């Protein structure tokens, strides 16, 4: 019997050792699963934070470009009066040679002025046949046999814009 007892104790010892190994393995698996879950959560948080940071960076860059594009708007709007005066001077009829020379100088100044405005994003609103309230300001309505209702009959004052923003609408008369 003592051999059987010895054998039984050996089996119990092996089973106990085997159970301890299994328990240890289960504990390691549980810990590894917990660590993997923690890692996955942290990785997800990192990815979201990184994506949010990139979105903020893009939005700030867009706002910066927009601010730069429209920073000169007020200044450019004030310069339009000077532009109108130069254009009026160029349109004056001249009879003598001195007046023609002065007119030529004013024209050169006007051309240079227009190039500088264009360089800084100020553009003339192109003539539109059809009245567009986003681009035009109707000063009055006129009867016209040559124009359909809603068509621009005459441009009274040129309009300008910076990028897509109108800084001064084109003042027009519109056919009834």
Swiss-Prot record:
Family annotation (Gene3D superfamilies): 3.90.20.20, Head domain of nucleotide exchange factor GrpE
BP-aspect Gene Ontology terms: protein folding
Gene of this entry: grpE
Keywords for this protein: Chaperone, Cytoplasm, Stress response
Oligomeric form and interacting partners: Homodimer.
Positions of region (Disordered): 1-28
Domain of life: Bacteria
Subcellular location: Cytoplasm
CDD domains tied to this protein: GrpE
Lineage, broadest ranks: Bacteria, Pseudomonadati, Campylobacterota, Epsilonproteobacteria, Campylobacterales
GO cellular component: cytosol
Keyword Chaperone included in the entry's annotation: yes
Primary role: Participates actively in the response to hyperosmotic and heat shock by preventing the aggregation of stress-denatured proteins, in association with DnaK and GrpE. It is the nucleotide exchange factor for DnaK and may function as a thermosensor. Unfolded proteins bind initially to DnaJ; upon interaction with the DnaJ-bound protein, DnaK hydrolyzes its bound ATP, resulting in the formation of a stable complex. GrpE releases ADP from DnaK; ATP binding to DnaK triggers the release of the substrate protein, thus completing the reaction cycle.
An example molecular function term from Gene Ontology annotations: protein-folding chaperone binding
InterPro entries: GrpE, GrpE_coiled_coil, GrpE_head
Name this polypeptide is given: Protein GrpE
Residues of the signal peptide: none
Family affiliation: Belongs to the GrpE family.
